[in-house]
Curated annotation (Swiss-Prot):
Family: Belongs to the COG8 family.
Pfam families given in the database record: Dor1
PANTHER family tied to this protein: CONSERVED OLIGOMERIC GOLGI COMPLEX COMPONENT 8, CONSERVED OLIGOMERIC GOLGI COMPLEX SUBUNIT 8
Source species: Mus musculus
Subunit text: Component of the conserved oligomeric Golgi complex which is composed of eight different subunits and is required for normal Golgi morphology and localization.
Keywords: Golgi apparatus, Membrane, Protein transport, Transport
GO biological process: glycosylation; Golgi organization; protein transport; retrograde transport, vesicle recycling within Golgi
Taxonomic placement: Eukaryota, Metazoa, Chordata, Craniata, Vertebrata
Function according to Swiss-Prot or TrEMBL: Required for normal Golgi function.
Region (Disordered): 580-640
Record protein name field: Conserved oligomeric Golgi complex subunit 8
């Protein structure tokens, strides 16, 4: 009711004020209605229906009486509406039923139509794809038909192309290399034009396999005993195949020929070192020379006419061949040294001659390796000599362990009559016969002479110092063995045994050692040593003990055993003395000096190259005790 007050007209307000008040009143009415009917009519519901709002505004503008009658009026109007609706339903119920049935049927039909349309829409993509596939297959069939027609028309040409791999394989296996190379060139042209065609790719792959087989066959031919014309053809085929560069082709050629050479060398029997090395020398000399001749005929070591392109590097192709030749020579020297160390008997000079001839033949191709042979033979010669000397020392030590001075006394007692000395040739070295009274010394000298005889077969001047040092070491060990024997037996020596032992030491120092010194002078003449060093023979003494043994160093440990002499002979260590004469109570006046007794020679005249007695260059080393120039070595207790 309070909200209806502003709706009363005011006589004093103007028209503008009245309109404003009315608008404000409507707003206030809506707010009041919203608060009054909040529980029954939600605000959103009556705001969406204009009739409800209009009716409510109409009620808000009505008087009290009308508002009191409004519920009754609404009830009557409702009853009236219900009666009208009931009458309408009774009058038209068949229509309503028919309409409901039609509506239901229409609703059901629409559902069926909707389901059918859904199934149709689901099948349309598959149908569309099937149509596309049909069109595509039709196009493919059409294209295939056109291709089959074209293939039928070009059947002969296609068959020839398809038979290329079989024809290529036949040519390769029958060694028709020229025809195989022409087929390969034709296939390369096909590949450049039709590389995307699978059939062409298959043909190319099969032809490449045949080319690989042909490459293996050509390289295998180089691994056989092939002659120069065949080598030229094979290398020509390899160059036309364009598989290797020029440097790689040279390496392949040398590898193949090297494999053939190694197969020949491997087939040589290895049981006998001398037979193995002689056959190796012959095979290497003949076949290596052939390989070098073939290489130089096929490949040129001249500089290329055109400079290398930008970004390319040059290969020193000449170094490939020279490196291979050096490798082969190095391998030959290794085999030579191995067989020499295995032992070849007394045929070292013959083997040296063969090797020198081998090196000389290689000088014609610029690969003279004779300078490399000298160190090999020197090492083998000194090693063999050292081994023989060591064995001689060991045998001497073994004999001294069982040596007794009693047997020596019997020998000396029975040798009052002079022994018959065999006739010797002029200019030969006769071993001291006094050593026959002392079997250990005689056998030791025999073994050393056997070592000297073997050394004479190949005795370079460069070994003078090593041979001298080896002999000095051996004599030093012999001296120590004699001293050890003296220390062990001195306590039980009788006066006679002591005298015999003194004679034993005297024979060792004054007969055996000087004789070995003379042998060294025969092996290494002082004049030859001086000429090698580029000095005069008089200056040779400044270079130490070259070619002679230091007798003083060997004599010094035994000095306390030897009796003191009134005149002591001293070998000047700076001169080469051929011998120490046997001690005598007195010397002739002309020999009472400190100078060694030497033969009369002109100044600068070399010592004669005298062979040891009865020792020419033998094919086999002389046997111990039976060689000419050796002292017979009796057993202890045996009569000489």
């Amino acid at each position: 009711m309070a909200a209806a007050l502003p709706l009363q007209p005011s006589t004093t307000a103007s028209a503008t004020t009245t309109a404003t008040a009315v608008a404000l009143g409507e707003v206030e009415d809506e707010g009041l209605l919203a608060s009054l009917f909040r529980d029954r009519f939600p605000e959103a519901q009556w705001r969406e229906k204009p009739d409800v709002g209009r009716y409510l505004r109409e009620l808000s503008g009505s008087g009290l009486d009308r508002l009191r009658r409004e519920p009754e009026r609404l009830a009557e109007e409702r009853a009236q509406r219900l009666q009208q609706t009931r009458d309408l339903a009774f009058a038209n119920y068949k229509t309503f039923i028919r309409g409901a049935e039609c509506t239901e049927r229409i609703h059901r039909l629409f559902g069926d139509v909707e389901a059918s349309l859904g199934r149709l829409l689901d099948r349309l993509p598959r149908f569309q794809q099937s149509c596309r596939n049909f069109v595509k297959e039709a196009e493919e069939i059409s294209s295939s038909r056109r291709m089959n027609t074209l293939t039928l028309n070009r059947h002969t040409e296609i068959l020839e192309i398809l038979e290329i791999p079989q024809l290529m394989d036949t040519c390769v296996r029958n060694s028709y290399h020229e025809e195989a190379l022409e087929l390969a060139a034709y296939v390369r042209r096909l590949e450049r034009k039709y590389s995307s065609i699978p059939v062409i790719q298959g043909i190319v792959n099969e032809v490449r396999q045949s080319m690989q087989l042909m490459l293996s066959q050509l390289i295998q031919q180089l691994r056989t005993n092939i002659q120069l014309p065949a080598c030229l053809r094979v290398i020509g085929y390899l160059r036309r195949m364009d598989v290797f560069t020029e440097a790689e082709l040279r390496v392949k050629f040398l590898q193949a020929r090297d494999a053939w050479l190694r197969s020949i060398l491997t087939a040589i029997p290895n049981d006998d070192p001398y037979f193995h090395i002689t056959k190796t020398i012959e095979a290497c000399r003949v076949h290596l020379f052939d390989i070098i001749t073939q290489y130089r005929a096929i490949f040129s070591d001249e500089d290329p006419l055109l400079p290398p392109a930008m970004g390319e590097y040059t290969v020193n192709e000449g170094a490939i061949f020279h490196g291979w030749v050096l490798q082969k020579i190095s391998q030959f020297l290794q085999v030579l040294e191995t067989d020499l160390y295995r032992g070849i008997g007394g045929r070292l000079d013959s083997l040296l001659g063969q090797c020198m001839y081998f090196g000389l033949s290689f000088s014609r191709v610029g690969a003279d390796f004779r300078g490399q042979l000298a160190p090999v033979f020197q090492r083998v010669a000194i090693s063999t000599f050292q081994k023989a000397v060591e064995e001689a020392v060991e045998k001497f030590q073994d004999e001294m362990t069982s040596y007794t001075l009693i047997s020596t006394a019997a020998i000396l007692g029975s040798s009052n009559t002079p022994a018959t000395v065999p006739a010797t040739q002029p200019g030969t070295l006769q071993p001291p016969m006094v050593l026959l009274d002392f079997p250990p010394l005689a056998c030791f000298l025999n073994n050393i002479l056997v070592a000297f005889n073997d050394l004479r077969l190949c005795c370079p001047v460069a070994l003078a110092q090593d041979v001298t040092g080896t002999l000095e070491n051996a004599l030093t060990k012999v001296t120590k063995t004699i001293l050890a024997f003296h220390r062990a037996e001195e306590a039980v020596f009788s006066s006679g045994e002591h005298e015999i032992f003194v004679q034993f030491c005297t024979a060792f120092l004054e007969d055996l050692v000087p004789y070995l010194n003379r042998c060294l002078q025969v092996l290494f003449p002082p004049a030859q040593i001086a000429q090698t060093l580029g000095i005069s023979p008089t200056q040779l003494s400044k270079h130490g003990n070259l070619g002679h043994v230091n007798i003083s160093a060997i004599q010094e440990p035994l000095a306390f055993i030897l009796p003191k002499r009134e005149t002591v002979f001293c070998l000047d260590e700076q001169e080469l003395g051929p011998d120490l004469v046997a001690p005598a109570p007195e010397l002739p006046a002309e020999q009472r000096s400190m100078e060694p007794v030497t033969e009369k020679r002109e100044p600068g005249e070399p010592l004669p190259q005298e062979p040891m007695e009865g020792e020419p260059l033998p094919a086999e080393p002389p046997s111990e005790g039976g060689a000419i120039g050796s002292v017979p070595c009796p057993q202890p207790g045996e009569q000489p």
